[in-house]
C-alpha cells in the first residue's frame, strides 16, 4: 500500500497561508513549471510548503543554501511529517580542503577531509528511501548538484533477500563485498558484515543502531531479523530486506574492467601530449599517481579520490552531464528552493569555481583531463533536470521574478506581528543616540542587532560599548557555523544583549527577543545597503511586538526608499487584517534549541596572498583585480557581505599600491 504524506500539527493554516497553499497547489496541478512564494520573515513559509507537499503528494527536494539552514528545515519538516521519510543530504565533510596546486610557489595541497559518519549515514538513508517509497522529502544543501554515482547502478546492485530464497552463504558474502561492504568480525559498524557459522549479520550503510541478521539452513534463507547491533535484542522479524550499496560510487566488476582500460588509454594519450610539449615533470607525476590508483582499483575495487574517475566508471562520454541526487528522484518530483535569492546565485557559481581549481591540477599533472567531468551541474543542466520548482524568499531575486511573473504573497503572520516601524536619524551623534536606545531595550530584557559597513567600525563600536558596560559581542566572518549558532543561542539566553556585525542576514538570526535593529550608514548605496539586503535586515525586527528599526542616514537613497515603502505596504496589509479579525500582535514564544549535531559547515574560501602590488607585473595586477572584483560581486549577490567587504578593502589597497 502506498504511503501518503500526512502533517501532524496542532495548527491549521492561518492568515494568508490558506490562499498561498491553494494557489501553489493549483499551479502544480495545472503543470506550472516555476512559481514564486514571497513570504515575509516569520509568516510560516515552512508550514505553507508542508501543506503544499501534503496536497500534491509528490517526492520533494528542499534545497537550502548552507548546512545550518538545511539542518533547521530538516528539524521542522521532521516535526510536521513524523510518519513519512524526511531525509537529510548535505556534504559529509566536517572539514574539507580540496586538492589544489599553487604554480607560483610550486605547492601541491593534498585533499584533506574529515568525513562526518552521521551525515554519511543520513546520505545513504536518503538515497535508499527514494528507491523504497514515494513519501520522501529530502532536505539538501546546494552540494546536491555535485556528481554522485549512477542511480541505475546503485539500484541494480541492491542485494535483495527473502525468507525461503535459495542462496549459498558464500555467494551472499561475495555480493556484499561487490557493493563495498567489508567483513569485520571484531569492529562491527556501518558498512560492514560479520559471519558466525550459518548466521550472517549485515550493518547497512543507512542505519546507525540496527543491523540485519540472516540465518541460513543449508542453501536456503531460513529467517531474517532486525537486531539491535549493540545489545543483540531482536526488534522485528522481516520477510524481505534490501541491502543498498555502501558507496554511491559503486561499479560492477565488468564495468570496472572497461573503466580501467579507458583510464589507461587516456593516460597514454595524456603522457604523449605532455612529453611532446616538454612537460616531463608533469608527465612523470601523472603517470605515477594514475598507475597507483589503477592498481588500487584492480585489487580493492576502489581508490582514494575515485570520484575523479567517475566519468569512466559510469562509461559517459567527455563533457557529459554528471549524475547527481536529482537523478535518484522519480520523473515527477517537486523542488523547493528556500531563500532562493541566495541559493539560485550559488547554484550558478558552483560550476565555474570548481572548474578553475581542477584545471590547474590537470595542467600540472596532478589529475587526468577526465577529472574535469567530476563536477557540479552547470546552471543550464540543473534547469533541465528540474521538473516543478517553487522559489521561496522574502526578497525574490531578478531571475525568479523573470521565471514566474505571478508572485504568490504571504505577508500576514499567524501571530499578528507587524513589519517594524522605521525611524531615520542623522549620522551625527549616532553612537550616543544608539547607546540610549540600547539601554532602553536592556531595561526591558530585550536584545539589539547592529549592522555596520566595515570590519573596523564593527570592532571599534564593540570595544566602545564594552567600555561603557554593555554586554556585547561581534559576529565576524572568521567565526565558524557551529560557533555562530552558539553565539546566537547565548544572545537569546541573555548572556549578552547586543550583537554587532557586517552581515546579519545569515541563517538563524530570526530571534524573537530582538526588538531593535540599528542600521549604521544606511545611506551608503552599495551591495551592503541594497534594497534586498535592507528588506532582509528590517525583517530581523519583525518577531517582536515592540520591534523597531533605526536607519542612521543623512539622506534617503533609492534603495532605502524602496525598502521603506515595501515595509510600509506590508505593515498596512498586516494592520488591516489584525483589525478585521481582532488580533493583538504577540511576540513569538520559541524555545532555545541546542546545536544540531550534523551541522558543521566547512566554509571554503579562496585566500589572496598579500603580494605587494609593486612586485607584480602590470598584467598580473590587472588579472588579480579583475578576479577579485568578480568574486566580490558574486559574494555580494549571495549576501555574503563580510567576504565582499573584505575583498573591497583588499582591492582598494591593491589599486592604491599600483
From Swiss-Prot:
Superkingdom to which the source organism belongs: Bacteria
Any single GO CC term annotated in Swiss-Prot or TrEMBL for this entry: excinuclease repair complex
Binding-site residues, ATP: 39-46
UniProt xrefs under SUPFAM superfamilies: C-terminal UvrC-binding domain of UvrB, P-loop containing nucleoside triphosphate hydrolases
Keyword line: ATP-binding, Cytoplasm, DNA damage, DNA excision, DNA repair, Excision nuclease, Nucleotide-binding, SOS response
Subcellular location: Cytoplasm
SMART domains according to UniProt: DEXDc, HELICc
Motif Beta-hairpin, residue numbers: 92-115
UniProt domain Helicase C-terminal: residue ranges: 430-596
Known function: The UvrABC repair system catalyzes the recognition and processing of DNA lesions. A damage recognition complex composed of 2 UvrA and 2 UvrB subunits scans DNA for abnormalities. Upon binding of the UvrA(2)B(2) complex to a putative damaged site, the DNA wraps around one UvrB monomer. DNA wrap is dependent on ATP binding by UvrB and probably causes local melting of the DNA helix, facilitating insertion of UvrB beta-hairpin between the DNA strands. Then UvrB probes one DNA strand for the presence of a lesion.
Family membership: Belongs to the UvrB family.
Domain topic, free-text comment: The beta-hairpin motif is involved in DNA binding.
Name listed for the protein in its UniProt record: UvrABC system protein B
Species whose genome carries this gene: Bacillus cereus (strain ATCC 14579 / DSM 31 / CCUG 7414 / JCM 2152 / NBRC 15305 / NCIMB 9373 / NCTC 2599 / NRRL B-3711)
Amino acid at each position: 500500500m502506498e504511503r501518503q504524506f500526512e502533517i501532524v500539527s496542532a495548527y491549521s493554516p492561518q492568515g494568508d497561508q490558506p490562499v498561498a497553499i491553494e494557489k501553489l497547489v493549483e499551479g502544480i496541478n495545472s503543470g506550472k513549471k516555476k512559481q514564486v512564494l514571497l513570504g515575509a520573515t516569520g509568516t510560516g513559509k515552512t508550514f505553507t510548503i508542508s501543506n503544499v507537499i501534503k496536497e500534491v503528494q509528490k517526492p520533494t527536494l528542499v534545497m537550502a543554501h548552507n548546512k545550518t539552514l538545511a539542518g533547521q528545515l530538516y528539524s521542522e519538516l521532521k516535526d510536521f511529517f513524523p510518519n513519512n521519510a524526511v531525509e537529510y543530504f548535505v556534504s559529509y565533510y566536517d572539514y574539507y580542503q580540496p586538492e589544489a596546486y599553487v604554480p607560483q610557489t610550486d605547492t601541491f595541497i593534498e585533499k584533506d577531509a574529515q568525513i562526518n559518519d552521521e551525515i554519511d549515514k543520513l546520505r545513504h538513508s536518503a538515497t535508499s528511501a527514494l528507491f523504497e517509497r514515494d513519501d520522501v522529502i529530502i532536505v539538501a544543501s546546494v552540494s546536491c548538484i555535485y556528481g554522485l554515482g549512477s542511480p541505475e547502478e546503485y539500484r541494480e546492485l541492491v542485494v535483495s533477500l527473502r525468507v525461503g530464497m535459495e542462496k549459498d552463504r558464500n555467494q551472499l558474502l561475495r555480493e556484499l563485498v561487490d557493493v563495498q561492504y567489508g567483513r569485520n568480525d571484531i569492529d562491527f559498524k556501518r558498512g560492514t558484515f560479520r559471519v558466525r557459522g550459518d548466521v550472517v549479520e549485515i550493518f547497512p550503510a543507512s542505519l546507525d543502531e540496527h543491523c540485519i541478521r540472516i540465518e541460513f539452513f543449508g542453501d536456503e534463507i531460513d529467517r531474517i531479523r532486525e537486531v539491535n547491533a549493540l545489545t543483540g535484542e531482536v526488534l522485528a522479524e522481516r520477510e524481505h530486506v534490501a541491502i543498498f550499496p555502501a558507496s554511491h560510487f559503486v561499479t560492477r566488476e565488468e564495468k570496472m574492467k572497461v573503466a580501467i582500460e579507458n583510464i589507461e588509454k587516456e593516460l597514454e594519450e595524456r603522457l604523449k601530449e605532455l612529453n611532446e610539449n616538454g612537460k616531463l615533470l608533469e608527465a612523470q607525476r601523472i603517470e605515477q599517481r594514475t598507475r597507483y590508483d589503477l592498481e588500487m582499483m584492480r585489487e580493492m575495487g576502489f581508490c582514494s579520490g575515485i570520484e575523479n574517475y567517475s566519468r569512466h566508471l559510469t562509461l559517459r562520454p567527455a563533457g557529459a552531464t554528471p549524475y547527481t541526487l536529482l537523478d535518484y528522484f522519480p520523473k515527477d518530483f517537486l523542488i523547493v528552493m528556500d531563500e532562493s535569492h541566495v541559493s539560485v546565485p550559488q547554484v550558478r557559481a558552483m560550476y565555474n569555481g570548481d572548474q578553475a581549481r581542477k584545471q590547474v591540477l590537470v595542467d600540472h599533472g596532478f589529475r587526468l583531463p577526465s577529472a574535469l567531468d567530476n563536477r557540479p551541474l552547470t546552471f543550464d543542466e540543473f534547469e533541465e533536470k528540474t521538473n516543478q520548482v517553487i522559489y521561496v524568499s522574502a526578497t525574490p531575486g531578478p531571475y525568479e521574478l523573470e521565471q514566474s511573473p505571478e508572485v504568490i504573497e504571504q505577508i500576514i503572520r499567524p501571530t499578528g506581528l507587524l513589519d517594524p516601524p522605521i525611524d531615520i536619524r542623522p549620522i551625527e551623534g549616532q553612537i550616543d543616540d544608539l547607546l540610549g536606545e540600547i539601554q532602553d531595550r536592556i531595561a526591558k530584557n530585550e536584545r539589539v542587532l547592529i549592522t555596520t559597513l566595515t570590519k573596523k567600525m564593527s570592532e571599534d563600536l564593540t570595544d566602545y560599548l564594552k567600555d561603557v558596560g554593555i554586554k556585547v559581542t561581534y559576529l565576524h566572518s572568521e567565526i565558524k557555523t557551529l560557533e555562530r549558532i552558539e553565539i546566537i543561542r547565548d544572545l537569546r539566553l541573555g548572556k549578552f544583549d547586543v550583537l554587532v556585525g557586517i552581515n546579519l542576514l545569515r541563517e538563524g538570526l530570526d530571534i524573537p527577543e530582538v526588538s531593535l535593529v540599528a542600521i549604521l550608514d544606511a545611506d551608503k548605496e552599495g551591495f551592503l545597503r541594497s534594497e534586498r539586503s535592507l528588506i532582509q535586515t528590517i525583517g530581523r525586527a519583525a518577531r517582536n511586538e515592540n520591534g523597531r528599526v533605526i536607519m542612521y542616514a543623512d539622506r534617503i537613497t533609492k534603495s532605502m526608499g524602496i525598502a521603506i515603502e515595501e515595509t510600509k505596504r506590508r505593515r498596512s496589509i498586516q494592520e488591516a487584517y489584525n483589525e478585521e479579525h481582532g488580533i493583538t500582535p504577540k511576540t513569538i514564544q520559541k524555545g532555545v534549541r541546542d546545536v544540531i549535531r550534523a551541522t558543521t559547515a566547512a566554509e571554503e574560501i579562496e585566500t589572496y596572498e598579500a603580494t605587494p602590488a609593486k612586485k607584480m607585473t602590470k598584467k598580473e595586477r590587472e588579472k588579480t583585480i579583475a578576479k577579485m572584483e568578480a568574486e566580490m560581486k558574486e559574494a555580494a549577490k549571495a549576501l555574503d557581505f563580510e567576504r565582499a567587504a573584505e575583498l573591497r578593502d583588499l582591492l582598494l589597497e591593491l589599486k592604491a599600491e599600483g
